[in-house]
UniProtKB/Swiss-Prot annotation:
Family in the record: Belongs to the ARF family.
Subunit structure: Homodimers and heterodimers.
Protein name per the record: Auxin response factor 25
Native organism: Oryza sativa subsp. japonica (Rice)
Residue ranges, compositional bias (Polar residues): 575-586
UniProt-annotated location(s): Nucleus
GO BP annotations, alphabetical order: auxin-activated signaling pathway; regulation of DNA-templated transcription
Amino acid sequence: MKLSPPASADMPQALPENDGEQRCLNSELWHACAGPLVSLPVVRSRVVYFPQGHSEQVAASTNKEVDAQIPNYPNLPPQLICQLHNVTMHADAETDEVYAQMTLQPLSPEEQKEPFLPMELGAASKQPTNYFCKTLTASDTSTHGGFSVPRRAAEKVFPPLDFSQQPPAQELIARDLHDNEWKFRHIFRGQPKRHLLTTGWSVFVSAKRLVAGDSVIFIWNDNNQLLLGIRRANRQQTVMPSSVLSSDSMHIGLLAAAAHAAATNSRFTIFYNPRASPSEFVIPLAKYVKAVYHTRVSVGMRFRMLFETEESSVRRYMGTITSISDLDSVRWPNSHWRSVKVGWDESTTGDKQPRVSLWEIEPLTTFPMYPSAFPLRLKRPWASGLPMHGMFNGGGNDDFARYSSLMWLRDGNRGTQSLNFQGHGVSPWLQPRIDSPLLGLKPDTYQQMAAAALEEIRYGDPSKQHPATLQYQQTHNLNSGLNSLFASHVLGQVQFQPQQSPLQVVQQGHCQNTGDSGFLQGQLPRLQLHNTQQLLKEQELQQQQRQHVLQEQSSQEMQQQLPSSDHHVADVASESGSAPQAQSSLLSGSSFYNQNLLEGNSDPPLHLHNNFHNFSNQEASNLLILPRSSQLMASDGWPSKRLTLESAVHPEAPSMHPKIEKVNHQGISHFPGAFPPQSARGCSIVQDCRADAENRLLSSSFELQDGMTSIITDANRETDTMAIPLLRYSGADLTTENTLATSNCLGESGTFNPLNNISVNPSQGATFVKVYKSGSLGRSLDISRFSSYCELRSELERLFGLEGQLEDPVRSGWQLVFVDRENDILLVGDDPWQEFANSVWCIKILSPQEVQQLVRGGDGLLSSPGARMQQSNACDDYSASHNMQNIAGNIASVAPLDY
């Protein structure tokens, strides 16, 4: 039996390269003899060496526990991170017992601070694939008998017999670990017939001194060679040879060598005996990090662990964690070696260790500390305690890993305090999941953040307000400037070409926006300077006219100046000749929108007067109050049109007042600039809508989380329809969509009703959702036609030819899932019907194969709702969206759509 030799700092640290290559054995055969659970680490990789585990191997080999008189080495850490320079596989010449020689070198403190793991360039040890193992019986080891081979094993590993012969027979040549050849006669005979090794077998048994209970292994490798190895049964050695050092000497030697190497960063050599060692004590660093820092365990948690059984097979045994503590808190404090005390379920596991290490077990209940393959995210928030570095400052996974460095030493007084294990070898495990529900964010977090920031802007130093606003709105993306400039081009076309229809003007503006990208880029610095001057000017006017506006525009004056219900809003911009100011206000509209959208202010005339400071009192009042009975949509008479920007406020939010921006000559305003960060979960897609004051499904192109919407309306006294290009939001992309033909789209309050993410038929006022099924074209379904789930399932069965399949999903395997407005994927039928009808976004029909794939955690089966909506609408409205340009692609989202 090979034991660890006495190690010292003066002994040779590694074998010569040529000698090491000569001694290196066949990797497949060596691993087959070592056992199915043994895997040597890759050369030139980083490993964790446990002196405590090395001492266990010595104690198991010598049948003597560690003596308490052995000196302690306080400077030797319980786990030593090393570089593996060399691995050589060996086999004892007499017993064929396998062992490995490893040359390690502890990492320096500078190397331990490296944030990335180096790529493992070495080749992994080759494991056997085509082999069989059999435990010898008494007849197999008798001198007059042969070796009986199981039929399946013989057909799998041995070369095929020629059954035309009688009896079928052949000669086999096998090589052992020492490259010795052994010849056997393979014959198929007996009653019943079986595969036997006859001639040559008894010679092999005698030479190897095999007994019943030992095992033999045959391997057929890729080179069409037959390999032969043996694995001896564990037999306790009662008398140690006198030439072998005592157990205490070996313990002292290995500890002294490791302590000297740790202090001097020098190389040292160890020997690993997989058949004698209770557990591996040289662990790959990636495996160690995953188990210790990315697997949460607690007392009472269930787990399973792999064990080797008869004939080189493995089996999982179940157990329960009963305690988590140090195995030896005096000599090895803060050690992860066998830190988990367990209780085994089966009584037959009496020979199993009562304590195990974290990397040896597989907890049955774990927490999502690294990304899961299952595409569905958690429906309810879970306070995981994950740090929020990189979430709101634009940091990515690398920033997150750099901030959340992994603590690998629980003793704060020793060596390096942390390791940033983020690199090639462990990236699938070490990228934490960034999810707003996991971070415990409440739904109104974004509104609270925006309100707090707005208060600071409103009452803070004016010199600090506008540069930050300008930097966010104008330099975040080129598209922010393109939007405003595009709006100015539209205004110019409307002003100088009054005979064109609104739709033609919008289409021409899109074409020019496509072809004049170079011109727009050249005008962007000029646009930024103009916006800066405009913002500063507005701020000065706000400070000067605050008291004046509060006195002149009281609520009594506003009520007196209200127009009658049969009159329309006058063309204030045309009468006052304020086209330049209105156009400038459009260019700087993003600051107006961002400021007035979120803040709750008790004096709405103040902000309107700041933006349109040259309007008279009556004109400003007309801008604030719109008659409920007026026909606000028009398609002709373009010079007299007015565009109003409203913030439709939920009835339960009395502190939020509608803010209306009025623009002369009525270009289409596409929300210029970049919006402040907000969740993308409330965004929606609108294609068509029709006037219906009682239908709450009419909506805007943007919806915030609290139900507040931002819409574009048009006021005109002549006709009741006009073309408004809609906005589509998908991910971080906001593009114009097909034109919205609308009439009387306002509710009784003068604003659009909240969006429910459902398309509206312009001819019937019916609400539609889209239904998808793999292998079939998508269909649109009027959800208002149904009053129960049974009617919905019957219609889906008829549309997709699935009669009788959707009513009984347990029997048929077909499942119906839907995406709601919160981008959650749920089963159809779990919610009350009315709640389902109000929240459904789209429906997906899953086949039995897709359900199984989903259960197994298949990626991509249910893609993110944002991506799926983008794809589906691009298919349905290709002609409309193909020519449209991205006019607000710089909209930021705090939480991503994809989970």
